[in-house]
Amino acid sequence: MSTKEKLISHVMKEEPVGSRNKVTVVGVGMVGMASAISILIKDLGDELAMVDVMEDKLKGEVMDLQHGSLFLKTKIVGDKDYSVTANSKVVVVTAGARQQEGESRLNLVQRNVNIFKFIIPNIVKYSPNCILMVVSNPVDILTYVAWKLSGFPRHRVLGSGTNLDSARFRHLIGEKLHLHPSSCHAWIVGEHGDSSVPVWSGVNVAGVSLQNLNPQMGTEGDGENWKAIHKEVVDGAYEVIKLKGYTSWAIGMSVADLVESIIKNMHKVHPVSTLVQGMHGVKDEVFLSVPCVLGNSGLTDVIHMTLKAEEEKQVQKSAETLWGVQKELTL
């Protein structure tokens, strides 16, 4: 008799139940690992699967996390074979090529499309009913690519979009007003990154519209220069990259925030990337961030945001830029 047999007596033969709240993270780079640790610490899944083509890095990261299993409630698994991801509820894609110096955005996009052509069919094969969350950049275009390659209905494919941009925005407004970001309600919509659109008309604290108090808010003529806050949101990522080489923690927390709303069926509203064709005057098949309701079925509803004509025009301009890139892609 083995030590185990002397210690434990079976009452019944256990049938594998399978995981109900399994989350997969594809890519164990800085963003993938920050997402993984955020998901683990928030206790969101009963199993976390990690997958990457770089076998040694993957093995090392998984072992490192597993060594902390005593302090967690989530089973951690990892393999370069996608079978490890089977039956996931949510799959978070953070993998992708890094932009090289002097590389055009279109070239980077096409390289990432080629990577997605391998990743997405593997996800679909093992988790045909999952909710697919794209984090890799440029996130709006790659969410469109993932949607096309997966064949999933649009409510099961979303991009992390401007969830982080809006968090940065609320943090900076909070700093200026000496308030906690959760008390500063503000939204950034449109494209994640340089051409994102701050909805100044919607910025409020306790229901008090800041634009009612300062009608010039967000414009060139504003003596308080609130416009600089949006510039800081856009430049924030570049600043962090310049200082530490990459961004990771805030995007990781942002991903966990979205995963939580899905797994816990919270029906919480987040600015995430979804198909916006037919909204705000957008004619093409593009994905941009608008306020969306997230729950157990995925992205169930879109909130009709009241945008000013100028804001709407910016969204349309973003859409045209994205479509210009998308129509050149070979899927």
Swiss-Prot record:
Pfam families (alphabetical): Ldh_1_C, Ldh_1_N
Keyword flag RNA-binding: no
Amino-acid positions noted as binding NAD(+) in the UniProt annotation, renumbered to this chain: 29-57, 98, 137
Reactions that this protein is recorded to catalyse: (S)-lactate + NAD(+) = pyruvate + NADH + H(+)
Enzyme Commission identifier(s): 1.1.1.27
GO molecular function: L-lactate dehydrogenase activity
Predominant location category: cytoplasm
Family: Belongs to the LDH/MDH superfamily. LDH family.
Self-association and partners: Homotetramer.
Protein function: Interconverts simultaneously and stereospecifically pyruvate and lactate with concomitant interconversion of NADH and NAD(+).
Protein name: L-lactate dehydrogenase A chain
Taxonomic lineage from the root: Eukaryota, Metazoa, Chordata, Craniata, Vertebrata
